[in-house]
Swiss-Prot record:
EC numbers: 4.2.1.33
Name of the protein in its database record: 3-isopropylmalate dehydratase large subunit
Gene name linked to the record: leuC
SUPFAM superfamilies recorded: Aconitase iron-sulfur domain
Organism lineage: Bacteria, Pseudomonadati, Pseudomonadota, Gammaproteobacteria, Pasteurellales
Cofactor entry: [4Fe-4S] cluster
Key word Transport present: no
Record-listed [4Fe-4S] cluster binding positions: 347, 407, 410
Associated pathway: Amino-acid biosynthesis; L-leucine biosynthesis; L-leucine from 3-methyl-2-oxobutanoate: step 2/4
Record InterPro entries: 3-IsopropMal_deHydase_lsu (IPR004430), Acnase/IPM_dHydase_lsu_aba_1/3 (IPR015931), Acoase/IPM_deHydtase_lsu_aba (IPR001030), Aconitase_4Fe-4S_BS (IPR018136), Aconitase_4Fe-4S_dom (IPR036008), IPM_dehydratase_rel_enz (IPR050067), IPMI_cat (IPR033941)
Key word Calcium present: no
Pfam (any one): Aconitase
Natural source organism: Pasteurella multocida (strain Pm70)
UniProt catalytic activity: (2R,3S)-3-isopropylmalate = (2S)-2-isopropylmalate
């Protein structure tokens, strides 16, 4: 019987499945951070339980860490307490921790892949909704809640219902200047933010295959933003080349055996999907969100939609509310909209290729007057590599702030946030009301588009700019 990649991954991890009950599946890798883990560890202590497989759990600090210093208290008392608790809990339960001063510290979804903790065929969980990022490697990866974090720590398993199967194919090749972020925003614009609800999405097609692993991670990272449980991409030679020689990747004969297995991880010919969506890559423009969810997105040269022209009353009401919050009129182009801040970072776009793309725009230019622009590498290793390449100097000379690794302005859980009414061009994944700070207005874009907005003080079409 033909199977989808998702079915192969799920079936390979079923520990127990009884009639009428939710299947119990095995978890290969558990990634932990400071925000969703304290209560889980407290639960273990209260019941006198240990962590069943400490070697399969790795922790880092990311959400609360300040990016202008390595002071634990730099983001406030709550952040300090959570980071101190994580250090205490990981030491007590024998779990590896990349703390705030470790070179491997970083955003959990950047750190995992670059260490080789993320491998094809795995099941991976983390108490964070963007765990889908790891699906770029042909892994089944999804976010879990704090009570589930405790369950995985104690049992290395989790109850998980089977999801519906969705295929999103991006046909052909993208045009110059189009990034993975533009691809996934265009996908969400077509499916809407609820189009993938109840599904695990497999991304495929020539445009997806052409992406680097970092680009694929950007796409899978935002699968959750179309409502999906997770997103996956079948592994291939690009995957294997990325993983080769990573610290936690198999070595020697084990590597050869692993690759032989990984090559079987693809959807069979004739495998059936519940939903199929197709996009033409050549039609994708640089994308910018105009509203308060990632599905409210347009190409840079398109006008903001007029809610009155929307036939669906719910969609119309949502658009009206979004435009009111964003303080934007309909029918104008976003190239007419000025911005106050720029954020280049997050688990979506803080890897070395993202920083190179932004630096190519920033080089030889200056941040516009009145604009604050932050560049926040996704990990200590990304920061180290960027500095080896001189990217930090490019950003600093252009007037960007070169920060330390962390989640930063993606979410208002640290000191990097928007003030009420401020408008931000952001490479993050969510533009919800208040996401980057109470009353803040977020526009999601690619790293190159964000850098260009910083330089020009407004949104521009990067395809018209000379790269350096």
């Amino acid at each position: 019987m033909s199977k989808t990649l998702y079915e192969k991954l799920f079936d390979a991890h079923v520990v127990h499945e009884a009639n009428g009950e939710t299947p119990l599946i095995y978890i290969n890798r558990h990634l932990v951070h400071e925000v969703t883990s304290p209560q889980a560890f407290d639960g273990l202590r209260a019941m006198g339980r240990s962590v069943r497989q400490p070697s399969k759990t790795v922790a880092t600090m990311d959400h609360n860490v300040p990016t202008d210093s390595r002071d634990l208290a730099g983001s406030g008392e709550m952040g300090r307490v959570q980071m101190v608790e994580l250090a205490k809990n990981t030491e007590q339960f024998g779990i590896t921790l990349y703390d705030i001063n470790h070179i491997n510290q970083g955003i959990v979804h950047v750190m995992g892949p670059e260490q080789g903790l993320t491998l094809p065929g795995m099941t991976i969980v983390c108490g964070d909704s963007h765990t889908a990022t790891h699906g770029a490697f042909g892994a089944l990866a999804f976010g879990i809640g704090t009570s589930e974090v405790e369950h995985v720590l104690a049992t290395q398993t989790i109850k998980q219902a089977r999801a519906k199967k969705m295929k999103i194919e991006v046909r052909g090749k993208v045009r110059d200047g189009i990034s993975a972020k533009d691809i996934v925003l265009a996908i969400i614009g077509k499916t809407t933010m609820g189009g993938g609800t109840g599904h695990v999405v497999e991304f495929c097609g020539e445009a997806i295959r052409d992406l680097s692993m970092e680009g694929r991670m950007t796409v899978c990272n935002m699968a959750i933003e179309l409502g999906a449980k997770s997103g996956i991409i079948a592994p291939d030679e690009t995957t294997f080349a990325y993983l080769k020689d990573k610290p936690y990747a198999p070595k020697g004969k084990d590597w050869d055996e692993a690759v032989a297995y990984w090559q079987t991880l693809h959807s069979d010919e004739g495998a059936e999907f519940d939903t199929v969506v197709t996009l033409e890559a050549s039609e994708i423009e640089p994308q910018v969100t105009w509203g308060t969810n990632p599905g409210q997105v347009i190409g840079i040269n398109q006008p903001i939609p007029n809610p009155a022209e929307m036939s669906d009353p719910i969609e119309r009401q949502s658009a009206e509310k979004a435009l009111a919050y964003m303080d934007l009129p309909h029918s104008i182009k976003l190239t007419d909209v000025a911005i106050d801040k720029v954020f280049i970072g997050s688990c979506t776009n803080s890897r070395i290729e993202d920083l190179r793309a932004a630096a190519a725009i920033a080089k030889g230019r200056k941040v516009a007057d009145g604009v604050q622009a932050l560049v926040v590498p996704g990990s200590g290793l990304v920061r180290e590599q960027a500095e080896k390449e001189g990217l930090d100097k490019i950003f600093i000379e252009a007037g960007f702030e070169w920060r330390l690794p962390g989640c930063s302005m993606c979410l208002a859980m640290n000191n990097d946030r928007l003030a009420p009414g401020e408008r931000c061009a952001s490479t993050s994944n969510r533009n919800f009301e208040g996401r980057q700070g109470r009353g803040g207005r977020t526009h999601l874009v690619s790293p190159a588009m964000a850098a260009a907005a910083a330089v020009y003080g407004k949104f521009v079409d990067i395809r018209n700019l000379e790269l350096h």
